[in-house]
């Protein structure tokens, strides 16, 4: 059995980690970064880009670059009015579900998420040197049942068996407390990421991580702060020039990148200049956007967002029944906790400095890896007791929601309650399963409905229908209803409201595998073309340097093989390029042998490769790419 990796599938960035012995390790991706942008792009020539490659081309390809897909996962089309309004890509209604439309094809949010998960899976496989099939994936603590199930589906599509869905603040607490198993602490984990906000109160001691309460807002995160800056810039430019940049997808994408950059800069500076030359043009000529944004102004335009942070904190502390003065540490998680105003709010609310000892971008993935180690048996003496974030119940007479399991109940858990019929001679009942905190059924989220039939006719109130709720360790719900008189039972596993069928998931898995093969083939083609290009370059260079030293009777064969390889490189297949390389190498090696009889000379095969190139394992020459990074840019 291989390793169980831990994946933080974030709104803005994703991260993967794995246990190496007793220590968790965050894995660098192929670009050398420890986090990967949660972005997927489809290019005009049909290529699919994931991560940094997708982010790099977003400005020139905004309508085909998908970001913040996590905000659509497990949600109906009519549940995401604000999200679809600000997305530059098309979000369409397909049978009530929110789907992304790229060209003529629609993708479910689970499919797009699976593409990001595949990238994380490949990153782990490259690091470990073995296949990875199992993972622990994190979700916001305040994700509902539908969103959790949809995340599991995304894992399946990516070719992963999701061993556990774990709440992000709980994962962070695991990472924070792993080396503190002998001490006892009460900890608040404050997790403000790219798209969601969670606050959890936990008690840590003797290897037990017990969640006392959790609360949050799945519509509050770094994206929302970015949007405030985007709107501010667009409004200011409209005042100055009379042009609304929000109507231009490319200009809007430039505003988005500038807004995110400005937000980051204002964490360490009190003001920043946003300078976007040639943002648009009129008959009078090009227009440039130059606006100065101060930290005070940023805090002013985001005042309503900062205010929204405190309410979940108040509820979480109240529901935990832990006095504020007994909370030992406030651990900051998520990139948005770097905002100075957020840190000040946390300090004012809890009355103490927040703990910044963990890396806010990586700690959740580290915790997921630790949970993977627990499941594998590699990490011992750790017990995780999580809670369900929202109350669960059914609709009863009068449209009332009757709760069976209250919010912040430790999971896994099971609860049964007996109900009866509402009418005389009623032979069937509908069980309408709900999640939420409101009194009326219509104000809560519907998780599913099912019917229990063949109830013997009887006066109302006489039949006894036992309804059982069972929440597993992933926080996913199973419901059953049983007629106690006949023993007849009906059960349902509550799936996501945007549930994909098994057939759809299998098809998506096959598509994902096919894309993985395509990506592998494309990389092989690029590698061999690069090798051929390097061989052509070094051969021409040697021909120029050696000149008349090359025997005249050998020159036609070299020139012929060189031209043949050039033609194959331009128009040929992988096979013809490989054949051309072998032929040129063979001809050159014969010439090199003659030359070496006279005096040693460098050559493409036998001598030193030109500077900036390196020999491949097969003897071919690869280009070595270098990137110069300014010291200020390297963070």
From Swiss-Prot:
<dbReference type="Pfam" id="PF00012">
    <property type="entry name" value="HSP70"/>
</dbReference>
<feature type="region of interest" description="Disordered">
    <location>
        <begin position="594"/>
        <end position="635"/>
    </location>
</feature>
<keyword id="KW-0067">ATP-binding</keyword>
<feature type="compositionally biased region" description="Acidic residues">
    <location>
        <begin position="624"/>
        <end position="635"/>
    </location>
</feature>
<dbReference type="InterPro" id="IPR013126">
    <property type="entry name" value="Hsp_70_fam"/>
</dbReference>
<comment type="similarity">
    <text>Belongs to the heat shock protein 70 family.</text>
</comment>
<feature type="modified residue" description="Phosphothreonine; by autocatalysis">
    <location>
        <position position="196"/>
    </location>
</feature>
<dbReference type="InterPro" id="IPR018181">
    <property type="entry name" value="Heat_shock_70_CS"/>
</dbReference>
<dbReference type="InterPro" id="IPR029047">
    <property type="entry name" value="HSP70_peptide-bd_sf"/>
</dbReference>
<dbReference type="InterPro" id="IPR029048">
    <property type="entry name" value="HSP70_C_sf"/>
</dbReference>
<dbReference type="InterPro" id="IPR043129">
    <property type="entry name" value="ATPase_NBD"/>
</dbReference>
<keyword id="KW-0547">Nucleotide-binding</keyword>
<keyword id="KW-0346">Stress response</keyword>
<comment type="function">
    <text>Acts as a chaperone.</text>
</comment>
<keyword id="KW-0143">Chaperone</keyword>
<protein>
    <recommendedName>
        <fullName>Chaperone protein DnaK</fullName>
    </recommendedName>
</protein>
<dbReference type="GO" id="GO:0140662">
    <property type="term" value="F:ATP-dependent protein folding chaperone"/>
</dbReference>
<keyword id="KW-0597">Phosphoprotein</keyword>
<dbReference type="GO" id="GO:0005524">
    <property type="term" value="F:ATP binding"/>
</dbReference>
<dbReference type="InterPro" id="IPR012725">
    <property type="entry name" value="Chaperone_DnaK"/>
</dbReference>
<dbReference type="GO" id="GO:0051082">
    <property type="term" value="F:unfolded protein binding"/>
</dbReference>
């Amino acid at each position: 059995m291989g390793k169980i990796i831990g994946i933080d599938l974030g709104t803005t960035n994703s991260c993967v980690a794995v246990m190496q012995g007793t220590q968790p390790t965050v894995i660098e991706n192929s670009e050398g970064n420890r986090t990967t942008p949660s972005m997927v792009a489809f290019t005009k020539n049909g290529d699919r880009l994931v991560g940094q490659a997708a982010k790099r081309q977003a400005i020139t390809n905004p309508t085909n670059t998908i970001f913040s897909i996590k905000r659509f996962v497990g949600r109906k089309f009519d549940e995401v009015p604000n999200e679809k309004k600000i997305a530059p890509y098309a979000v369409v209604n397909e049978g009530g579900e929110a789907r992304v439309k790229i060209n003529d094809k629609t993708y479910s949010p689970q499919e797009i998420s699976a593409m990001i998960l595949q990238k994380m899976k490949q990153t782990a496989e490259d690091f470990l040197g073995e296949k990875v099939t199992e993972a622990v994936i994190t979700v916001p603590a305040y994700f509902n049942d539908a969103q959790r199930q949809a995340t599991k589906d995304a894992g399946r599509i990516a070719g992963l068996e999701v061993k556990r869905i774990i709440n992000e603040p709980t994962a962070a607490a695991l990472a924070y407390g792993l080396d503190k198993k002998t001490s006892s602490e009460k900890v608040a984990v404050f997790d403000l990421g790219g798209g969601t906000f969670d606050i959890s109160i936990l008690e840590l001691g003797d290897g037990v991580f017990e969640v006392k309460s959790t609360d949050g807002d799945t519509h509050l995160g770094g994206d929302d702060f970015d949007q405030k800056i985007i709107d501010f810039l667009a409004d200011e430019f409209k005042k100055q020039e009379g042009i609304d940049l929000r109507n231009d997808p490319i200009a809007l994408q430039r505003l988005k990148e500038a807004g995110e950059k400005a937000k980051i800069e204002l964490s360490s500076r009190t003001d920043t200049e946003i300078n976007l030359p040639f943002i648009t043009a009129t008959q009078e000529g090009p227009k440039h956007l130059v606006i100065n944004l101060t930290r005070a102004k940023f805090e002013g335009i985001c005042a309503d967002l900062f205010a929204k942070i405190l309410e979940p904190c108040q509820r979480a502390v109240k529901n935990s029944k832990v006095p504020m003065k007994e909370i030992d540490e406030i651990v900051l998680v998520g990139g948005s906790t770097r905002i100075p105003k957020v840190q000040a709010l946390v300090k004012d609310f809890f009355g103490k400095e927040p703990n910044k000892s963990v890396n806010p971008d990586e700690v959740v993935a580290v915790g997921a890896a630790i949970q993977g180690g627990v499941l594998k048996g590699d990490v011992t003496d750790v017990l995780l007791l999580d809670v369900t974030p929202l109350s669960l119940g059914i609709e009863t007479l009068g449209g009332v929601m009757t709760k069976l399991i209250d919010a912040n109940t430790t999971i896994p858990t099971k609860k049964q309650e007996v109900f009866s019929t509402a009418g005389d001679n009623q032979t069937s009942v509908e069980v309408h399963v709900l999640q939420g905190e409101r009194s009326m059924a219509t104000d809560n989220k519907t998780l599913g409905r099912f019917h229990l039939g063949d109830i013997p006719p009887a006066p109302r109130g006489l039949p006894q229908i036992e309804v059982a709720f069972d929440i597993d360790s992933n926080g996913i719900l199973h419901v059953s209803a049983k007629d106690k008189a006949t023993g007849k039972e009906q059960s349902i596993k509550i799936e996501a409201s945007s549930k994909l069928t098994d057939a759809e998931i299998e098809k998506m898995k096959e598509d994902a595998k096919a894309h993985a093969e395509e990506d592998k083939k494309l990389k092989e083609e690029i590698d061999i073309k690069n090798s051929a290009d390097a061989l052509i370059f070094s051969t021409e260079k040697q021909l120029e340097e050696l000149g008349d030293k090359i025997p005249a009777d050998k020159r036609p064969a070299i020139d012929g093989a060189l031209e043949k390889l050039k033609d194959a490189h331009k128009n040929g297949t992988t096979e013809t390029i490989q054949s051309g390389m072998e032929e040129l190498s063979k001809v050159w090696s014969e010439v090199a042998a003659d030359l070496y009889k006279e005096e040693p000379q460098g050559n493409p095969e036998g001598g030193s490769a030109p500077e900036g190139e390196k020999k491949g394992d097969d003897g071919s020459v690869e280009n070595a790419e270098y990137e110069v990074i300014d010291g200020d840019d390297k963070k």
